[in-house]
């Protein structure tokens, strides 16, 4: 929120609920986008569309990657059960230890500033890019991330899920388009995307 407020102070205008239908180009250069609220002219378009980044790239004539959904589920514990470990605790799966290309490093335990303990996330491939449903299987996985003997599944107060924009190369895509001038790819951003955000913004 603080970053968004800072951006607003520095002249950024946020347009929420504007769905992009096409990317406008002329002579191989971006000129703007067509949205369901009209045309927005722009000399640059930064494609940070998450799970739909490949669709936007296709509109700009430069789709060289395919995004597939990978759902992650996180369980929130009751803050009445104070975590025994006040810091981040991560675990690595046996497959990751063996150097195999796995969908998840393993998840972990994440205490919030309010001392709610977060467990997870899981990593499940899903065909629907907007599948934010939660399942018992995913909840069971998040509980395997628990290393705190004082915390049990009875302490879960909420479960939520989101879909990561995974690329088949399992790496971030942050680069200028080689085919369409003014078009910038910021795609396939997974973990540690939040921690990387300032560096990604600086590079872009």
Stretch-by-stretch model annotation:
Residues 13, 63-67, 152-155:
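A short alpha-helix-loop-beta-strand transition element characteristic
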Residues 21-24, 157:
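Conserved positions in beta-strands of structured domains
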Residues 14-16, 35, 47, 119, ...:
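General beta-strand structural signal in soluble alpha/beta enzymes
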Residues 2, 104, 113-114, 125, ...:
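C-terminal catalytic lobe of FAD-dependent flavoproteins
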Residues 10-20:
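A conserved beta-strand/loop element that lines the FAD pocket in flavoprotein oxidoreductases
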Residues 1-11:
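Rossmann-like flavin
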Residues 18, 50-51, 198:
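Alpha-helix N-cap/helix-start capping motif
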């Amino acid at each position: 929120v603080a970053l968004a407020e800072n951006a607003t102070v520095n002249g950024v205008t946020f347009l929420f609920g504007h769905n992009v239908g096409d990317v406008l180009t002329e002579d191989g250069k971006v000129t703007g986008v067509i949205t369901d609220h009209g045309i927005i002219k722009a000399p640059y378009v930064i494609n940070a569309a998450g799970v739909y980044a490949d669709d936007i790239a296709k509109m700009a004539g430069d789709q060289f990657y395919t995004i597939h959904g990978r759902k992650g589920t996180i369980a929130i514990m009751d803050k009445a059960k104070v975590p025994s470990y006040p810091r981040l605790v991560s675990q690595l799966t046996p497959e990751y230890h063996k150097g195999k290309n796995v969908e998840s490093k393993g998840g972990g335990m994440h205490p919030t500033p309010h001392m709610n303990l977060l467990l997870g996330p899981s990593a499940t491939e899903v065909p629907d890019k907007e599948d934010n449903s939660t399942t018992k299987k995913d909840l069971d996985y998040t509980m395997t991330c628990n290393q705190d003997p004082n915390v049990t599944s009875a302490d879960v107060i909420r479960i939520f899920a989101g879909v990561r924009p995974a690329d088949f190369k399992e790496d971030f895509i942050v680069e200028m388009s080689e085919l369409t001038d003014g078009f910038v790819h910021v795609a396939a951003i997974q973990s540690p995307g939040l921690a990387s955000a300032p560096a990604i913004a600086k590079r872009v």
